[in-house]
Structures are given as structure tokens and as C-alpha cells.
């Protein structure tokens, strides 16, 4: 039950992502990607600091969990705005023949954040703190580090240049209602939802939930779980730019189809085999295999979605449907998986994850390859 409560708190930030995508997406499309990214990271800094300095329940009672909830809300708003604005910015500054590679590098930062957090935890656990110290106050250190990184990110973003595509489209975009433009592009909004369903559920299955799965279902020790997760994330980081570069050569659609087909056919047997193994090495290889499949989506997700929309609504077009879908199908991965486990039907979650990927496969089948139909140069 404690694991489930923690998962619900984790999901809270996802519920705020759609609102963040609207607020920061509108800001990015009207006033610039750079300013939107600066304010998003400020909000993340405040959210991390609130968690780092939050008093305990014994000190302030009910105000403690309320403070954590507010902090998670701030982080959710920031994450919701960050996705669309950052995916748009990198796609717009990239050379047309290198956008897939840039998209892969962009996803490295998402996985890299989890890898950095895991590294900090390993250092604290093994080198610096005792278990009692970590439980008493050491758990706050990663959030302090996160806040400091946010300050550094703000300093870097302050000196970024606005994209040429935004500056070229700014005058035309100002004459149009973003809501009317979004309505005119409703098919693309639906397409982003379809593209995202399977990918986001798979991503959070093999990242956030996987550590709990390895401990609770596979039966690995804490040390084994940490090492397996660390190695798998490192493997994922290495292959993202490679997959992205491949999409610059053969197009985006083949990679999406590959993820959809292999994910639909392979998720259930892969998770079933993973659950039954007792070997950390086998677990590591299986998760790497999963990443080799999932990366058909993760490595190009930014550029595929960005290429669907004109410049005037690109940040909102990418961010809003993604945030809604991530909240429903990404943020709920842990609660759903833990619910099935608590009911004694853990394989039900395997079928659920398979179904999500199959839904996306239907969209991948009919979508046109965005590399050849890109709207990156369109102002409105």
C-alpha cells in the first residue's frame, strides 16, 4: 500500500502537465521558445527546493504532505511546458537533414536525468551516508542538486538565441488565433495522441516502474536492481542518437512501425520472461532488448510531432496532446501495475501495456512519414 501511495503522488505531477503545456505552450508560440523554457525551469527549481526543505509530518502535521503536493504540482506544470517548448526549439534549430539525430540527443537528456538521479542515489547509499542518515535527511540531497541544476539551466537558457523559424513566423502568427489554428489542425492533435499512447506507457514501464518491478516481482536485491537499471539506462542513452540518425536516412515511419510491431508481439513474453528470471545479467539483457524496441519511438518522438505542425502553434500542438496522453497512459503506469500485482494478476498489466502499443501501431500504419511531409517551414 505504501508503494501505491507513493505512485499516486508521482502521478499527481502528470495530472498537472496538460495545464502546464497550455500555459507554457501558449507563451512559447506567442512570445518565443527561449522565454518559455526559462520560466519553465524556474518553476522546476522552486518545486525541487520545496521538496528539499519541506518539514516532516511530525513537525508540521498535515501541512507536510500538502507542501509535497504543491511542489509536485509546480514540477508537473514545469514538465508539461518543458516538453513542447524544448522539442520545438531543438527541432527548429536543427538542420533539416539532422533533425532525427537532434531528436535522439533531446531524448538523451530525458533518460540522462534519470541516470543522474540514480547515480546520485548510488553515491549517497554506498559512499557517503548510512541507511539511517539517508532515511532521516539524505533523501533531500537529490532535490537540492536538482534545484542547483535548474539554476544552471536557467543561466544557460538566458543566453540562448530565439529560433529563426519563430522570428520569421512571428508577425504572421500574431494575426491569427492560436485556438482557431489548433482547431484547424485537430487531425494532427489526434495523431500526436495516437503516436504517444504506446510509447509513453512503454517508456515509464521500463524506467520508473522497472526498479520496483525488479525488486518486487523479479526478486533482485537493491544493489542488483540499481546496477541493472543503471546499465540499461546507459545502453538506452547510447542508442538514442543512433536511431535518430537512422531516421534521417530512411525516414521516421519505419522506426515507428518497428516499435509498434515488435512492442505488440514482444511485450508480454519479454515481461513474463523477465519476471521468471533470477539472474541480474539476464534481467539486464532483457531490459536492453526492450530498449532496442522502445527506442524506435523515443529517439524520434520530438521531431515526428514537431514536423506535424506549423510554427505558429508548434509548441502547443506538440505539448498539449502529449501532456494529456502522458498523464493518462504514462503517469498511471505504476498505479495500474501495482494494482494488478496486488490483485494477484500481474500479467494483466503486461496485456495492458501490449494494448497501448497496439493502439499506437494502428496510427503508425496510417501516418505519413513526417520527414517527407514536414511542416517545419510553414508559418501558419
Give the ranges of each region predicted by the language model:
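C-terminal transmembrane helical hairpin of 12-TM major facilitator-type secondary transporters
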Residues: 253-300
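Helix-to-loop junctions at the C-terminal end of transmembrane segments
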Residues: 20-33, 240-252
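Extracytoplasmic gate region of multi-pass secondary transporters
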Residues: 186-235, 329-334
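Extracellular/periplasmic helix-loop-helix junction of adjacent transmembrane segments
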Residues: 1-19
Amino acid at each position: 500500500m505504501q508503494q501505491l501511495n507513493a505512485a499516486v503522488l508521482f502521478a499527481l505531477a502528470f495530472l498537472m502537465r496538460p495545464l502546464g503545456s497550455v500555459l507554457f505552450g501558449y507563451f512559447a508560440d506567442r512570445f518565443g521558445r527561449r522565454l518559455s523554457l526559462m520560466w519553465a525551469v524556474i518553476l522546476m527549481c522552486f518545486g525541487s527546493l520545496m521538496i528539499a526543505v519541506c518539514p516532516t509530518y511530525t513537525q508540521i502535521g498535515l501541512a507536510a504532505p500538502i507542501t509535497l503536493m504543491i511542489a509536485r504540482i509546480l514540477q508537473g506544470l514545469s514538465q508539461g511546458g518543458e516538453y513542447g517548448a524544448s522539442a520545438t526549439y531543438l527541432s527548429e534549430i536543427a538542420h533539416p537533414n539532422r533533425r532525427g539525430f537532434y531528436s535522439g540527443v533531446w531524448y538523451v537528456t530525458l533518460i540522462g536525468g534519470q541516470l543522474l538521479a540514480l547515480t546520485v542515489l548510488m553515491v549517497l547509499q554506498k559512499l557517503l551516508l548510512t541507511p539511517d542518515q539517508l532515511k532521516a535527511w539524505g533523501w533531500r540531497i537529490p532535490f537540492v542538486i536538482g534545484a542547483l541544476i535548474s539554476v544552471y539551466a536557467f543561466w544557460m537558457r538566458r543566453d540562448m538565441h530565439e529560433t529563426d523559424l519563430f522570428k520569421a513566423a512571428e508577425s504572421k502568427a500574431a494575426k491569427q488565433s492560436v485556438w482557431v489554428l489548433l482547431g484547424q489542425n485537430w487531425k494532427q492533435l489526434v495523431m500526436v495522441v495516437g503516436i504517444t499512447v504506446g510509447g509513453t506507457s512503454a517508456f515509464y514501464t521500463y524506467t520508473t516502474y522497472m526498479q520496483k518491478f525488479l525488486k518486487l516481482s523479479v526478486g533482485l536485491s537493491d544493489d542488483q536492481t540499481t546496477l541493472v537499471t543503471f546499465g540499461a539506462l546507459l545502453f538506452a542513452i547510447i542508442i538514442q542518437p543512433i536511431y535518430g540518425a537512422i531516421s534521417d536516412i530512411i525516414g521516421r515511419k519505419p522506426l515507428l512501425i518497428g516499435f509498434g510491431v515488435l512492442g505488440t508481439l514482444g511485450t508480454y513474453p519479454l515481461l513474463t520472461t523477465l519476471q521468471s528470471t533470477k539472474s541480474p545479467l539476464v534481467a539486464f539483457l532483457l531490459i536492453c532488448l526492450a530498449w532496442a524496441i522502445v527506442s524506435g519511438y523515443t529517439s524520434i518522438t520530438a521531431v515526428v510531432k514537431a514536423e506535424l505542425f506549423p510554427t505558429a502553434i508548434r509548441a502547443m500542438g506538440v505539448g498539449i496532446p502529449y501532456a494529456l496522453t502522458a498523464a493518462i497512459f504514462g503517469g498511471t503506469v505504476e498505479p495500474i501495475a501495482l494494482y494488478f500485482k496486488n490483485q494477484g494478476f500481474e500479467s494483466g498489466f503486461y496485456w495492458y501495456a501490449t494494448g497501448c502499443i497496439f493502439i499506437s501501431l494502428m496510427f503508425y500504419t496510417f501516418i505519413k512519414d513526417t520527414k517527407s511531409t514536414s511542416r517545419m517551414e510553414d508559418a501558419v
